[in-house]
């Protein structure tokens, strides 16, 4: 784990790690979830820098009944703590039937941005917004029925929606890991000089993408509708 950093002017407490010069990527590993039991537990993530040092630990807080009935459609809070055990980021996802979103707060109680899903028939699309709901970035994903074919890239683009300035990558899991759990790994890449708040919001986008598209357990409600 990395040692605590000095508070930086204009950077929310706890986001100093994201404001470091040279930090251009984050890596997420999810703990084993729903292993063998078939029931979804609260997700937990290790968040590391590019040299493998853990800088944050994220833990979901959601209702067990709601989690196992509605699965990836559930609402939740994600509490993110630094290595001192201080909660520095909170993410709030309401339960919605469509066009999902997540609010990112740093410190908890102070909104720094939103991730909002856009309407699209076949391709995942999201907008990254500031606290005033002004769109700053776009995220564009691939045709997801092909998601078993290797690493899956979600491109982070500017307002013109042309050139990529970053990327969220779902890295392919090993066969054994996929058999026993929902364990996944992600890499988030962004410009070195990106604002620390926007890096935190992209982290929220990654967590939302993981739960929306790559979580397999739960969702008993949909199974009942389909007659299992």
Located regions from the model:
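Low-complexity or membrane-interfacial segments used for flexible interactions
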Residues: 1-77, 83-86, 94, 99-101, ...
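Aromatic (Trp/Tyr) and acidic
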Residues: 90
């Amino acid at each position: 784990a990395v040692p605590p950093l000095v508070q930086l002017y204009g950077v929310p407490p706890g986001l100093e790690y994201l404001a470091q010069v040279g930090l251009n990527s984050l890596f997420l590993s999810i703990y084993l979830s729903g292993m063998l039991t078939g029931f979804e537990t609260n997700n937990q993530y290790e968040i590391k820098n590019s040299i493998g040092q853990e800088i944050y630990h994220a833990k979901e807080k959601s209702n067990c009944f709601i989690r196992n009935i509605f699965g990836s459609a559930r609402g939740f809070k994600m509490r993110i703590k630094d290595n001192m055990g201080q909660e520095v980021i909170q993410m709030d996802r309401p339960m919605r039937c469509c066009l999902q979103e997540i609010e990112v707060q740093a410190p908890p109680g102070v909104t720094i941005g939103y991730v909002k899903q856009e309407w699209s028939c076949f391709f995942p699309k999201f907008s990254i917004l500031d606290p005033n709901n002004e769109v700053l970035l776009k995220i564009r994903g691939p045709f997801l029925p092909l998601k078993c074919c290797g690493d899956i890239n979600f491109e982070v683009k500017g307002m013109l929606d042309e050139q990529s300035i970053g990327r969220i990558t779902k890295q392919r899991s090993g066969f054994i890991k996929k058999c026993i759990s929902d364990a996944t790994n992600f890499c988030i890449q962004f410009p070195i000089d990106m604002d620390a708040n926007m890096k935190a919001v992209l982290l929220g986008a990654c967590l939302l993408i993981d739960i929306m598209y790559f979580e397999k357990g739960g969702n008993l409600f949909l199974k009942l509708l389909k007659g299992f």
